[in-house]
Amino acid sequence: MKKILISLMIIPLVLALMGAGVYALFSDTEAATGNTFTAGTLNLQVGSADPCTDKVTLSNIKPSDANTAATWLVKNLGSLAGSLDITVGAITNNENSITEPEAAAGDVTTPGGELGGLLKVAFWMDADKSGTWTSGDYYLKSDGTKVVWASGSTLPAAAYDLVNSYPHTWSGVQAVAATTDAGNFRVEYDFPDSGAGDNVAQGDSCVFDITFVLNQ
């Protein structure tokens, strides 16, 4: 009986020791601390400053004048790639005043001016910033389409149209990688000499906005 009692006492002790052995196995603990999610950035710069301060300001233009009105570097300063949209806004034609030659040419109405119906402009992206029409370049056609370089080194005449023809948005014209530029956006103008009828635009001005949007 005494042996049986001792045996019964030994069994729980053995079980306890076995349990202690299970919980005494090797272990190691690691913790990943300070986990952080950070949003990327899209930051578009057009021209010499961010936000944009550049604009086209031309005065005293006359029939037969043609030149570059603006050259603006378009750059994605952000950490994310984006898709570029460009919009030429509504055109406002200002009469400003009617000179004697204007009246003689038949311009007797105010406040709308006639310059936007005579002056031609072209908007194009000089992707490699070479200053010439080359591979990778494109222009924004007044019908809302994008026309890419196919041949030649001179911007095609078809790139130009009357200012009044342009209000439009061109969507997704170019993918712009993070911290890279899209190229130089150039504004060209041409004031064709069509004779005495051009007098109706004397002193007139046309005003519009060009908006650049970088989308994810």
Name what the model sees in each region.
Residues 36, 44, 51, 55, ...:
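Short linear motifs in intrinsically disordered/low-complexity regions
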Residues 2-63, 202-216:
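Short, polar/proline-rich extracytoplasmic segments that appear immediately after membrane translocation
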Residues 57-58, 131-184:
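Extracellular adhesion/glycan-binding regions together with long Ser/Thr-
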